[in-house]
Amino acid sequence: MSQQVIIFDTTLRDGEQALQASLSVKEKLQIALALERMGVDVMEVGFPVSSPGDFESVQTIARQIKNSRVCGLARCVEKDIDAAYEALRVADAYRIHTFLATSPMHIATKLRSTLPEVIERAVKMIRRARNYTDDVEFSCEDGGRTPIDDLCRVVEAAINAGATTINIPDTVGYTLPYEYANIFSALRARVPNIDKAILSVHTHDDLGMAVGNALAAVNAGARQIEGAMNGLGERAGNCALEETIMAIKTRGQLMNVHTRINHQEIYRTCQTVSKICNMPIPAHKAIIGSNAFAHSSGIHQDGVLKNRENYEILTPESIGLKQVQLNLTSRSGRAAVKHRMEEMGYGETEYNMDRLYDAFKALADKKGQVFDYDLEALAFINQQSEEPEYFRLDTFNVQSGSSVIATATVQLRCGDEQKTEAATGNGPVDAVYQAINRLTEFDAELVSYQLTAKGHGKDALGQVDIVVQYNGRKFHGVGLATDIVESSAKAMVNALNTIWRARQVEQELQRKSQVKDQKETV
């Protein structure tokens, strides 16, 4: 009988470490809800002790998620374990994931400890975590480079202490598939209590082996795969879950395994992660890239026309990629737009219909026809703009050319006040940014700028993603319009609104801290 492989998603923990700018609580929740729709069994959503913001994110997600187990990371340190519990306790189902290095290199140079001391510390912290929950995962950090005798000792002790999942990370992406599989085979053969825990894999892609290593380990008896959507993660990234899941769906019968993932949600989830994280998906990316189902060779095209299975081992529809796209016009009513959103998989709670329809009408008036990719882009911007906006772009005007200095005049609403400012710059976008910075007095430094066409042709929407730095922190902004200068301006205003909200939160935390100090003094 086919056995289930548990899918453990770490996009919001390990995956986020690859991003230029940290995600907001709202952005993390959007991704968590998408992962829940896709059906991940466990989602690791943060490192609660690391910062108040991460604690809040984990707690917020733990309250909202009902159909997946929510997990928080913790070092083998008492305060980490306690913080993870406090953040997760509001969840319907949760897991505490604690870890400690086990390789000789890490023990000697990073921990400055010994293997017996590592085992003693791991056992103590696993027991502490078990006081809070019966679902505790222990990771042997750098397990791929840990001698098998040492690994067996650690794993046996961890299971005896109460760990229900044992994770063996290939932390630096060093092992080859057959080596990694041999580790799991040895653990199953040599650890006497191994049947009391689920063996888990966590692979990195430094040598391009992450997915191959994960599948090799599953073939050797692992029954949980840890990874991130789109392969996000430290350095070269984590195991790409969408690839691993579809490999199991397509070839799982050879390993006698399956997952409980809703495959129809894979494409949409990957797109959500890509947009929110500002990490474009390469065209040649397996499963979800724009070329994944494209055929340019004449021989291949002929074969596909005769029978798609000649050159396609899975279908676009199997990951939720719809091949038929309907276009709407300015004459399309609210019901038509709502119906199309439902057909694309969007529930009513995922967007504000009034705001979406207003944006749809404005776009339809500009370009005539609105396609599925336009609606998806509008829905994404709609989700990003639901927070209160202190700054709002009213109008702008630019003058530029090969023989004149670019000049921009920007009218911005700042709270209840309307302000206007003009500035020059190195091109129209820079001129607009100079004017906006003068109006807001934030002086945010542009770190990165990225323009992506949403659709095809001269009237395609242009999405601008920027990262700005302010007071040592990086913030992401996104804007969408058929005019790239307008989308650039909207992206900057979006980033500045995020900065403004962050400042409000910091001021509120400072106020609460002062009140607390005053009460303690009294």
Swiss-Prot record:
This is 2-isopropylmalate synthase. SMART domains: LeuA_dimer (SM00917). Its EC number is 2.3.3.13. Mn(2+) binds at residues 14, 202, 204, 238. One of its GO terms (molecular function) is manganese ion binding. Pfam families: HCS_D2 (PF22617), HMGL-like (PF00682), LeuA_dimer (PF08502). Residues 392-522 are annotated as: Regulatory domain. Keywords: Amino-acid biosynthesis, Branched-chain amino acid biosynthesis, Cytoplasm, Leucine biosynthesis, Manganese, Metal-binding, Transferase. Residues 5-267 form the Pyruvate carboxyltransferase domain. SUPFAM superfamilies: 2-isopropylmalate synthase LeuA, allosteric (dimerisation) domain, Aldolase. CDD domains: DRE_TIM_IPMS. HAMAP family: LeuA_type1 (MF_01025). Belongs to the alpha-IPM synthase/homocitrate synthase family. LeuA type 1 subfamily. Homodimer. It comes from the Bacteria. The gene is leuA. One of its GO terms (cellular component) is cytosol. It is found in: Cytoplasm. InterPro entries: 2-IPM_HCS-like, 2-isopropylmalate_synth_dimer, AIPM/Hcit_synth_CS, Aldolase_TIM, LeuA/HCS_post-cat, LeuA_allosteric_dom_sf, LeuA_bact_synth, PYR_CT.
